[in-house]
């Protein structure tokens, strides 16, 4: 079993987006710690299994971040289940999890399931609109969410998601200072080695996604953060 606590860098691939064989090879051979498959729109059983089969040729951990029950399938090393803490809709707190347990509870290996305390911070993102997230958050709000995740829910991962824009470094830093047990994931808008380095100095793990489809060379440079220690 892989130890996610050691992961510093993850590439996130969207099954609804096209990626060439050459670019996929570069991503999977880049020394990233893991590949995560997940997205918001048009995530289907067919496109998830197609992307999974392409990535499975490479010897690195493969994660499915669950966005709907229909696209869940065996074959992944881990299944990340988001609970969107700042959603105003209970479905995105535990509704998807409830349906997953009703459908697959008898066969789930809970050692493979990682629960993520998600906080969505970009009001203009598809993720925020889809999950009906309240993104008008102060630093104090984020600190309270961090305490909730770390001390009360005791979730293994807290994911600060800016989805499409680069986040407020001071707010991410404030969250980090309240997490003593929970692993901090940061994702959103990382499009350069400099941004990757800046966020990797705060978060335990950075997630790099959109830039893969815009500039593969810039995406690959973000892996250089692994050369330095946090």
Swiss-Prot record:
It comes from the Bacteria. Mg(2+) binds at residues 14, 40. Prenyltransferase that catalyzes in vivo the transfer of the heptaprenyl moiety of heptaprenyl pyrophosphate (HepPP; 35 carbon atoms) to the C3 hydroxyl of sn-glycerol-1-phosphate (G1P), producing heptaprenylglyceryl phosphate (HepGP). This reaction is an ether-bond-formation step in the biosynthesis of archaea-type G1P-based membrane lipids found in Bacillales. It comes from Staphylococcus aureus (strain USA300 / TCH1516). InterPro entries: GGGP/HepGP_synthase_I, GGGP/HepGP_synthase_sf, GGGP_HepGP_synthase. It is an enzyme of class 2 (transferase). This is Heptaprenylglyceryl phosphate synthase. The gene is pcrB. Gene3D superfamilies: FMN-linked oxidoreductases. Keywords: Lipid biosynthesis, Lipid metabolism, Magnesium, Metal-binding, Phospholipid biosynthesis, Phospholipid metabolism, Transferase.
